[in-house]
Each structure stands twice: as C-alpha cells, then as structure tokens.
A protein has these predicted regions:
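RNA-binding accessory domains that recognize and position tRNA/RNA substrates
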Residues: 1-57, 61-72, 77-82, 91, ...
C-alpha cells in the first residue's frame, strides 16, 4: 500500500467554506515549507487518514446564523490542536463557542490599518508592529467575544478584528492574511503553522514530486500499465507528466477533444504533451 504524503510530514488541515481564496491559503502555507491539505468544511475528522497538527477555517460567502449555512464537524472543537479562523472562519468559531455574530452596519471591502492590542505580540502577531495593513472582505461581524477569548487587534469600525483564546490556541481573523494586500500576512501564517502548531517546515514541491513518482511506481508495479485521459488543462497535464516520469511508456495518454476547446487548442495541447513533456500520447 502506498504511503500518503500527509503521514510523512507535519500537516495542516484547511477546511474550505467556499472562499475564493481557499486555494491561496493552501499555496501560502506550502510556500512556508509546511504541508497542508484542503478539504470540504463538512469533512468528518474521524474519516481523515492523518492527524493534523493544526486546522485553518477558510472564509466563505455565507452567514453563520442563516439556516443552511455550512458548519464544521463538532469534533473540531474538542480535537485539541490549534485552530485559525479566517473571516467566515472567525465567525464560525464565535458561533460555535458562545460568541455572537450579526450583520455589519456596512460591508468592509479593501485595505484597513489594524491596531494590535497588548495580547497580540506573544502569539499570532509576534514580530509584527502596530499598526499593520490588512485586507478586509466581509459583511457580517462579531458582536460578542466567545468565552475565554481576548481581543488581539481592532479597527475603528471593527472592534474584534482579531481574537484569540491563548490557552486553547484558537484564533480568529476578520481579514485575509493569505492575500498580498495584507502586508504581514505571510508572517501571521508562519506564526500560526510553525510557531503555534509546531510544524516542521521541511516540505517542498521538489520533495513532493519525488514522493509522488515513487508512490505511482509502487501502486502500478514493475509491469503495470496505466491509461489516462488528458485535456491539456493544468490538472490532467500535471498528472500525465508525473505518470510519464514515473513509468515512461507504460502510461498511455489519450487526448480528449470535447469540441469546446479554443481554436487550435487541441493541437497545442498535443504538441506540449508529445514534444515538450515526452508523454506517450495515443
């Protein structure tokens, strides 16, 4: 049986509430040398094949107080690992831990200067000076702190811009640290995944590629063959390149032209796969 990457490296679980930035959170964490996996927000922790060192709750377009809005597995709150909620994720923390969330007086969208409170310097905002510029994108806001939480940062219009329960290592941000508009966003994420979660930042894309190639060889075996459909898009092209590097001509790629490709795109995809990536294209 092939080994999963998440069992070899310290792994952060990112729960996706439908934010346009969810994949960007994943990218930013991996850029820090920490492996992470993006899963639907409804995933059951008991179904995971790994034990995460920390959990990040993404933003999302819903309101936590509305019927039908997505919520995490209740086991998240007793799992015992650090949690970081971003935007909707902060509101999800408050909604589940006896805080209060309400519609804001107006939507906040764009850059804002955040003032750090005294409790901030020893945790999520270590090494960051006040004020710091962040990127807001929200309509709802926290109106009452959950039990055991303190304010870490605020703005004139958002008194609970960042909150934390320092004992339980649960933190919430009403802004997006993953976007480049947040000046020290990468440092905040590093403080969480490395400083608070204790993850080793020893993962890299090169090591991931080498690992996946060996995993493919283990699964396929010395004499096995694989047939795969490719479209020329990023996902199928990366998969084809990995399979080709792993098992050579024992991977048989079939280019699928569904009639909806752009002018000359099928020919360009064929050239890229056959000539540049040396994929065994049928």
């Amino acid at each position: 049986m092939a080994t999963e990457t998440s069992t070899l490296y310290d792994t952060v679980l990112i729960l996706d509430f439908g934010s346009q930035y969810s994949h960007l959170i994943t990218r930013r964490v991996r850029e820090l040398g920490v492996y992470c996996e993006l899963q639907p927000c409804t995933v059951k922790l008991a179904d995971l094949k790994f034990k995460p060192k920390g959990i990040i709750l993404s933003g999302g377009p819903n309101s936590v107080y509305e019927e039908g809005s997505p919520h995490v597995d209740p086991a998240v709150w007793t799992y015992g690992v650090p949690i970081l909620g971003i935007c909707y994720g902060l509101q999800e923390i408050a909604w589940n831990l006896k805080g209060e969330v309400k519609p804001g007086d107006h939507r906040e969208f764009g850059q804002a200067d955040v003032t750090l409170d005294a409790a901030a310097t020893a945790s999520l905002f270590a090494g960051i000076t006040s004020p710091t510029r962040v990127w807001m994108s929200h309509g709802d806001q926290l109106s009452k702190l959950p039990e055991g939480f303190v304010v870490l940062a605020h703005t004139p219009t958002s008194p609970y811009t960042a909150i934390g329960n320092l004992d339980r290592k649960i933190f919430g941000l009403q802004f997006h640290p993953e976007v480049t508009h947040t000046t020290h966003g990468s440092q905040m994420l590093r403080n969480f995944v490395v400083g608070i979660c204790g993850c080793s930042n020893n993962w890299s894309m090169n090591s991931f590629i080498d690992f996946e190639i060996e995993r493919i060889r283990t699964v396929v075996g010395e004499h096995g063959h694989v047939i795969g459909a490719v479209s020329g898009g990023v996902d199928s092209t990366v998969a084809a390149a990995l399979l080709s590097r792993a098992i050579g001509d024992r991977f048989h790629a079939i280019l699928v032209d569904n009639g909806l490709l752009r002018l000359n795109e099928a020919a360009e995809a064929e050239h890229k796969l056959r000539e540049q990536l040396k994929v065994n294209l049928k």
